[in-house]
Amino acid sequence: MILKKTSLPKVVKNILLDKKEPISLVHFVTNRCNARCSFCFIDFDDPKTFSHELTLDEIDVLTKNLGNSLLNVNLTGGEPFARKDLVDIAKKYLVNTTIQSIYVTTNASLPDRIKNFAEEVTAFDNQVELTFQISIDDMPDNHNRVRKVKNLFDKCIETYRLLKRMGDNINPVVSI
């Protein structure tokens, strides 16, 4: 990775000596999700589950206090694309930190939102690397059954293909 917003000596010093600033961050942006996976740890029956999401203003404050060594953020959840302000969240990280890559863990059920996110974020910063982690659990029927979403397997494939055509700095990956 070529460092664009910070220097290699600074990052190495932070990792090996100072250990003051994160270089990678997992940001759980929401508990909301349109799937109801049988293995999920989110308690969808608890009314408190969907409260306490950070607001965009709170994320602005957070990102301004992460230091100058952050290279990557993983936006995850629930389903991150359940948040309609996910592009704005990504922009906060791009403006306020030194990130060079954004990793999004998704069930790939919302291909239009995912495509829009990729287009808007790369238009905002054409140097950022975007990786979309798409999980496939089984063959189509079992995948859909376990996640309790009709045709989700097909949407995963559709989303993967859509992202694959979008550009060199957009990387769809599938975990099986």
Give the role of each language-model region.
Residues 80, 108-112, 133-149:
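Conserved radical SAM core fold
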Residues 2-129:
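Conserved alpha-helical substructure of the radical SAM core
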Residues 54-57, 133-145, 167-172:
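Short flexible/disordered coil segments
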